[in-house]
């Protein structure tokens, strides 16, 4: 996770918050076929230490890509988190990719906007084995030297992790180290989409 200048971060937060307000204004009664809204719930591992953590997500398709708007509350204040698109919501999580960062304000609220492919066609594929760059090699999760071959695997779930095990510990959570940040030394998962079936995560329902 790379820190940006504070001024830029504040401006981005204001713009994202404005976009969030517009995105959620329609409400569930005005949902269209090209957008979905759903909630993320607190993960089992964070239930005791962050019982009020939750998030609302809205995804709007423009056809060529989707805009995802996230509004999270009940998180520790001024804390960094990492957001992933994942195969299944709970451990072992399956195939996953690092979508971006989420940072809370002094009230423990966070707003974020991502643009990418977040619908029924979201998948990971590796037609063959190939060498992979080994950049972050610290234990316990060093970079792999090559990828495994896999047919297309659909990834319809979402998850949010503490960027740091210390941040987790400082907030009464387990200080378990996980690979879910840019340098593969994150804390535990905080939010996920386990309120949806394993094979039918929320992204599956968006079919523009």
Identify the role of each PLM range.
Residues 15-24:
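C-terminal segment of classical bacterial N-terminal signal peptides
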């Amino acid at each position: 996770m790379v820190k940006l200048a504070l001024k830029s971060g504040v401006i981005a937060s204001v713009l994202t918050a404005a976009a969030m307000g517009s995105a959620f204004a329609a409400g569930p009664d005005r949902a269209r076929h090209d957008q979905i809204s759903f909630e993320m719930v607190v993960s089992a591992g964070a239930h005791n230490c962050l019982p009020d953590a939750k998030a609302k997500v809205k995804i709007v398709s423009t056809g060529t890509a989707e805009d995802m708007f996230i509004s999270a509350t009940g998180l520790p204040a001024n804390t960094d988190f990492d957001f992933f698109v994942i195969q299944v919501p709970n451990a072992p999580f399956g195939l996953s990719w690092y979508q971006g960062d989420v940072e809370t304000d002094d009230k423990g609220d966070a707003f974020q906007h991502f643009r990418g492919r977040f619908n029924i066609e979201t998948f990971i594929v590796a037609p063959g084995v190939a060498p992979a760059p080994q950049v972050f090699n610290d234990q316990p999760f060093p970079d792999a030297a090559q990828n495994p071959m896999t047919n297309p695997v659909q990834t319809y779930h979402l998850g949010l992790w503490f960027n740091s095990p210390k941040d987790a510990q400082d907030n009464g959570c387990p200080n378990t180290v996980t690979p879910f940040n840019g340098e593969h030394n994150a804390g535990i998962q905080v939010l996920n989409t386990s309120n949806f079936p394993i094979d039918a995560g929320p992204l599956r329902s968006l079919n523009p």
